[in-house]
């Protein structure tokens, strides 16, 4: 970790439309928080620490979330486009599909009968330009990779967070290889992809600077930072919160106005929902939105936008632990009511 290097948290709340990838492979810099932001973090830390000291209350929250989860019959009624016969094979899992109301729509798309379908959901807690929006999506299938990259271009997504391996330890395919590990172009239909560089961090994150563009265009290619954390087990949690929080630290300086952050695992709900909940909670606390202290309400809102977000009790506890660890980092060496 670089020492003595700080950057202002103000970048989180600007309307900038630029993101410089030239230093994306450097260690994330420490945020310099305002006195108000420090006070918000101290207040939130007290609340979340109190919750962790009473694990039964956290378990009770998750049990309540599970009791109110959507039933399969409701999913059928709310996901008619996903269940259309022309789109069924585009779903990695038949019981994890986007709702009609907030699905990402590809426009134009090659097949009008598909109604621009891609298994991806827009996830947000507000319309504020200071808070990131996410696209929660499944790991692309071999026949949906072009759709995935079409979505990246159309939605102007500067970041892809990948929380899975391509193949798990049981040799089960969890995600299609929609990028490449060697230099040189790769084509997905009318889309060309080039890997500019690949870096591995001390926390096992793999960083890729990708450039994507339509093949027959004179426009400048779009730069995308691809962050992969392959050590997060399916349906489980990492042994600690360090790598997951490093992803967040690397994204602090990405202006939300650039476009949604794509987050995916295999199904796009468990690990994906967990990361989105952590990122969203910390970001809202820094923005002074103290309703973020109600994690159950945040997850419930996410589940209204994509079924099953934060899939297991362990993942829900991991959210609490990661939030506390990050708040402790942000407030290290300071006291409540001070900015030093």
From Swiss-Prot:
Which reaction equation describes what this protein catalyses?
Answer: O-phospho-L-tyrosyl-[protein] + H2O = L-tyrosyl-[protein] + phosphate
Annotated Tyrosine-protein phosphatase domain ranges read 58-326
Describe its PTM?
Phosphorylated by KIN10.
Question: What gene is behind this protein?
Answer: PTP1
Tell me the protein's name: Protein-tyrosine-phosphatase PTP1
| Lineage, uppermost ranks | Eukaryota, Viridiplantae, Streptophyta, Embryophyta, Tracheophyta
Compartmental location: Cytoplasm, Cytosol; Nucleus
Alphabetically, the GO molecular function entries are:
kinase binding; MAP kinase tyrosine phosphatase activity; protein tyrosine phosphatase activity
Tissue specificity is:
Expressed in roots, stems and flowers, and at low levels in leaves.
The consequence of residue 265 to S is: Loss of activity
Q: Which CDD domains does this entry report, sorted A to Z?
A: PTPc_plant_PTP1
């Amino acid at each position: 970790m670089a020492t003595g290097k700080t950057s202002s948290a103000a970048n989180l709340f600007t309307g900038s439309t630029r993101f410089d990838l030239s230093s994306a492979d450097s260690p994330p810099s420490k945020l310099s928080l305002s006195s108000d932001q420090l006070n918000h973090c101290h207040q939130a830390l007290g609340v979340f620490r109190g919750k962790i000291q009473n694990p039964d209350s956290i378990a009770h929250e998750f049990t309540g979330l599970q009791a109110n989860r959507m039933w399969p019959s409701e999913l059928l009624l709310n996901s008619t486009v996903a269940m259309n016969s022309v789109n069924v094979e585009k779903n990695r899992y038949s019981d994890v599909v986007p709702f009609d109301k907030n699905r990402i729509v590809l426009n134009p798309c090659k097949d009008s009968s598909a109604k621009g379908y891609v298994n991806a959901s827009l996830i947000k807690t507000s319309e504020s330009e200071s808070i990131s929006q996410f696209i929660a999506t499944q790991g692309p299938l071999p026949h949906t990779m072009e759709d995935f990259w079409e979505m990246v271009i159309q939605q102007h997504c500067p970041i892809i967070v990948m929380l899975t391996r391509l193949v798990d330890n049981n040799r089960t395919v969890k995600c299609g290889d929609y990028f490449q590990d060697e230099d040189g172009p790769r084509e997905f239909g009318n889309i060309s992809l080039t890997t500019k560089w690949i870096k591995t961090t001390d926390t096992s994150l793999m960083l890729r600077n990708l450039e994507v563009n339509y093949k027959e265009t004179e426009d400048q290619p779009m730069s995308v930072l691809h962050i992969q954390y392959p050590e997060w087990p399916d349906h489980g949690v990492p042994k600690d919160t360090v790598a997951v929080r490093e992803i967040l630290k690397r994204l602090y300086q990405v202006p939300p106005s650039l476009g949604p952050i794509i987050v995916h695992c295999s199904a796009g709900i468990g690990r994906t929902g967990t990361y989105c909940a952590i990122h969203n909670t910390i970001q809202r606390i820094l923005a002074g939105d103290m309703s973020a202290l109600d994690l159950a309400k945040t997850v419930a809102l996410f589940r209204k936008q994509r079924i099953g977000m934060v899939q297991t009790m362990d993942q829900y506890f991991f959210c609490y632990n990661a939030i506390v660890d990050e708040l402790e980092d942000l407030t290290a060496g300071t006291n409540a009511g001070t900015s030093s």
